[in-house]
Amino acid sequence: DTFVCSSWYYLRFCSPTEATYGFNKNDIDYWMPVDQYIGGVEHAILHLLYSRFFMRAIDYENKNFSIKEPFQSLFTQGMVCHETYKDDDDNWLSPEEIEKVNGQVVQKNNPKKIVKVGPSESMSKSKKNTIDPENIISNYGADAARLFILSDSPPEKDVQWSEEGIISSFKFVQKLWNLHQKILDELNKDHKKNNNNAIEKYTNKFLKDITHNLDNFSYNKLIANLHEMYSFMHKQIQEPYTKITLIENYQKILIAMTPIVPHFSNECLDVLQICLLYTSDAADERSSV
């Protein structure tokens, strides 16, 4: 059942309410082929083969069917990897069951037992080398986890999970939040209304780079864009500008950041909107633009 259904589900997605047949030809002609197929290499190799086989079979049996290839573009992402651990009896141990003591990896429940450390492999339930996402989110937040996975390497390469990496990403999210607070503080100050368009020029470049890297799956470069943006904005907010210039461009930057750090971006946008309600001269500046 899984083998059969997973080989043509994309056709059903085109006609979810079709009651008499698996799909509607008009819907298929409109939606197919799938624009972008994304999957791990082990899954994609077999599933891609089966799906193409099913599509050819349907095309052969149905002369009105005009789609021979189900997917227009293929992207195989890397896997998230972690070290593997075993006890003396070759039983797999999870990362939560081990700890480092005096440079040695031992079992938490029995520090006298040395743990055999294996190679870093794709996270797998059977090998217990997985990380509980709920613990990561609870300790560091979902955005920090997203940042680390995106920043470590190009998306087609494997990611080596490490505690140091997630901590580094967590600290960067904190730096972004501190920057947000400084920008809010600047909005409450009286600035000379100089026509400083450096922020506007940089924002346009930032949006262009973000869009390009998103379209090309260059997610690790997106994180580099965020670091560059942080450095620029941290210096730029000390310069003279009109409040409306800062507000409008900072909003654009936050919106562009949403696919990368959605929780942070939306929180900042909400706070910024509240701030605008109490910034009366911002409206006055807008009316004069």
Residue locations for each model-derived region?
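Conserved small/polar residues in nucleotide/adenosyl-binding loops
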Residues: 278-283
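Structured secondary-structure scaffolds
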Residues: 1-184, 202-235, 248-255
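Amphipathic alpha-helical
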Residues: 257-276
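N-terminal accessory segments
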Residues: 192-195
